[in-house]
Amino acid sequence: MLHKAKSSADSLFFTFDLATLIANMKQSPSWENGELNAMILSKSPEKQIVLTALHRGTEIRSFQSNDSITFQIIEGKLDFHSKKDSVTIDEGQMLTLHENIKYKLTSMEETVFLLTTANTIPVTVESNCM
């Protein structure tokens, strides 16, 4: 469940009940059909946070992203492979990946993680002041 702070239209933060969100994801028809399940929790031009649930044996091959990426494992574990290295990320661990790196993930068991992407390309704001 998403909880907005103090119901103000211009709140500065949001809170999420991850346990409830995960339980709801695992009760969805797509999950029961063996599909991965993902939910965008926050999205802006600078950052995106996605809660993702994978079945055991799910493999994800990346594209070469221009963003830096962080995987925070909430449940389960992932095998992470890049051209130069391999590592297993366990529950409670986090992996940060720089931009422009191709990778492959394999869930070793039912796994839930937060995927955060951060835009590393500077945003330029132009001003037409006279």
Sequence positions of predicted segments:
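Conserved short histidine dyad/triad with adjacent acidic residue
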Residues: 33-35, 45-65
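A short, N-terminal "cap"/entry segment at the start of jelly-roll beta-barrel domains
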Residues: 1-46, 81, 130
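Short acidic-glycine-tyrosine-enriched beta hairpin
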Residues: 83-99
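Ligand-binding loop in jelly-roll beta-barrel domains
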Residues: 99-123
